[in-house]
């Protein structure tokens, strides 16, 4: 049964659709022709789902791995997913799988922590998508829910999401705190032409180009740009290559970008809803977690073949890889070097270098074909933004936001203050968002894209502001100055988080700067992260991490199963027609 609010447009929007100019059909036809063979997206999706149902019947012939070991460098979702595929699909002994994490907690960028006394914090929030997370949903159908062990994590998330549909009523807000009508994308003919031309241009021609290299000034003043930018954290200087990937991959969501109906939410933060169940599954199967273990270098055997032979650690120790051992490395992490502030202190300027990117640089310098981290991690002024998590006693502030926006907590997704100098947005999740929240504690999350800009009301750059100052800037954007004192009295904490490399994966680059998951000539080495190259897929997603993990394991272990393909919505005539109509709204 289709979830309420997850298909089509919001109920109050029905009936507004009108017959579009014949140009719409021309654009849709051109795009469909350029795509080559036309696929039925629904058919492909059904095939992927059927594959998931068959996987239990496709068990491998027993294999004798002996005492072979697998070392997974990095403890984020990609490494954990790789471990799950090793256990589930390669029948590999979990006791011989080692996840090596430099921090004292697993999950990588999927974090969530705190208490009712000290406040809660998430560095970021991951918006899942039912239509495009093919391998994510397939994997987590195998992972039992912690709260409902008879159900899978996939069932748990989708059931929750269908019961809490998203339909934003306050997507963009102007400097007068007026909620804007964003039904129209705001494109002019030059914008439409540029967008169509981009979608028809092979990505091989887009090396090192930025979004502002392609589009004119008007494009960056459209409703579409404000919404697309803040939904996915793009900047004008972001990679045109990645923008094009997003337009193709998320074209199904383009017609409903103003309501964010395609957003799929987890019951709690992703650490508790995704990472902890996966960790429990791996623990049950004997996987070894080694936290506080920083890999600083990897040795390779001489010769044309790429064979990892040793791992070196920050404490001076080393592990030799024997014949048959495997190393799968997280070659970079977007939340490396993140720092936290509090209500009375700004997040400190990051001093720690990105550990995972430093390791990647050492590895890449040893031979060609292993990528280049410099374009991603070489310009911190362009790759940073700052988030903040607000914890309050009682629900006074959340009720005010609900009454203002018309969205109950969990139903509205992003609210963006488009004229704010920080390009500030907030999200109010369904409560509780943390299992440790009590009924009298509420939280919400927000972020600003332009951390070097002086605030409109707090006359300091966002990066220099305390949590209290960031919240005061937000209250002024809403013109709630007269309520500031009573609101601040309810605040437990506002925790700013500066992430210097959180947009690194969107930095302009050449095609060769991201290495393949399994480099050419590899016998036992692979890389998984948001910084590997997976044709057709888009970075900055949970799906990218899981897909990379699946490619790595299936390739290195010769798994005779299919990986769920990227669903080609950009080749489905109906989807293209809806997208073309949206361009003329």
Can you describe what each PLM-predicted range is?
Residues 118-158:
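Conserved FAD-binding subdomain of flavin-dependent enzymes
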Residues 74-76:
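Glycine-rich Rossmann-fold phosphate-binding loop(s) that bind the pyrophosphate
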Residues 87-114:
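Glycine-rich FAD pyrophosphate-binding loop
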Residues 21-70, 88-94, 578-585:
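Extreme N-terminal leader/targeting segments of oxidoreductases
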Residues 251-264, 324-326, 334-547, 554-556, ...:
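C-terminal segments that line or cap access tunnels to active or ligand-binding sites in enzymes
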Residues 555-585:
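Active-site-proximal substrate-binding core of FAD-dependent oxidoreductases
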Residues 249-326, 331:
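Helical element adjacent to the flavin cofactor pocket in flavoenzyme catalytic cores
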Residues 146-252:
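Rossmann-like flavin
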